[in-house]
Amino acid sequence: MLKLAAVPMPAPEPNNPNDPIHLLCAADARYGGYAGIMLASVFRANPGEAFDIHLLSDRMRAGDRRKLAALVARAGSRLTVHDVAARLAGYSDGIGNHLSRTAYARLLIADLLPASLPRILYLDCDIICTGALRPLWQLAAAMPLLGAVPDRTGERWKGRLGLPAAAPYFNSGVLLINLAAWRERAVAATIIDWMEANPDKLALADQDAINAGLWTEITPLSDCWNLQIGLDSGPLPAARLNEAVLLHYTSAHKPWRFRFRGLGAEIFLRHKRQSPWRFKPPTFRLVYRLRKSLNKRVGRWRPASPASPIASAKREAKASGP
């Protein structure tokens, strides 16, 4: 039986304005524009802040990549694009209702990101930033392995994963990652091992595996850093929206869908209108239903074969461990 380990909250490091915030995101052809809207909100809420953006691109459209490059340059920040399409070729696109194989891209970070980079902040594309990220980044230096916010719907997932009743379940849409510890302990290999051993338990991609394999080692963060406002998260007082720094539109009901009326709809639309993707059309429910049907046919998880790029990454991760 696993035991719940108490993970102390790290003390913030001194504010160093010369230290850029290293930010990681991943997008495919469907989500490239939404990654751009997310980053535009980050820059708007953090004027004068320097960012070093690492974008994991899985078949992103050339137009979105050009807009992203121009957006980052105007913000006085730096963009590095890592093409991961070939590395994800062993994965099916049909993971779930609103997830694609790109959800697994962050498992490649130990191999893709510079070895000299000690830590990074990962943000999902379905997030809007409304405040300063420097206070969150200050926590990263003392983070033992991962920092994350508990999932507001986590109780419904724990039984499926076999987690103890006292165990937390974290949302992986915002992660503070200690890259040195991630590499040293071959975390990606641990996650992939669990997915290969438990394909029938996977519903939320690597978020499930992160919780199943690492829940005793994740540092809980305040939900102001990942306020989940999906339609399945329940109602929230308006004051909570005002206090949050990162709004996360969880579940399949995204704010870019036609006639979306969920919590935070106007906030998303306002940031979209102020971004280079202001004319990006909404998606429609019929397309969503077709994709959902195809996902059920394809399957949620295809274990990596010994020759697949992900299996290779797993071997590399184990080889680089202690």
Where are the language model's segments positioned?
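Catalytic metal- and UDP-sugar-binding loop of GT-A-like glycosyltransferases, i.e.
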Residues: L123
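Short, acidic, metal-binding catalytic loop of nucleotide-sugar glycosyltransferases
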Residues: S41-E49
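Short aromatic/hydrophobic "clamp" motif used to bind/position activated sugar donors
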Residues: I120
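Conserved donor-nucleotide/metal-binding helix-loop-beta segment in metal-dependent transferases, i.e.
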Residues: I127-L161
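A glycosyltransferase accessory/donor-loop signature
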Residues: M1-R30, I37, G48, L179-P322
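Short internal beta-strands
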Residues: D52-R59, G147-V149
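Short alpha-helix within the catalytic core of nucleotide-sugar-dependent glycosyltransferases
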Residues: R66-A69, A115, T130-A141, A188
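Active-site-proximal specificity loops/subdomain of glycosyltransferases
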Residues: D64-L112
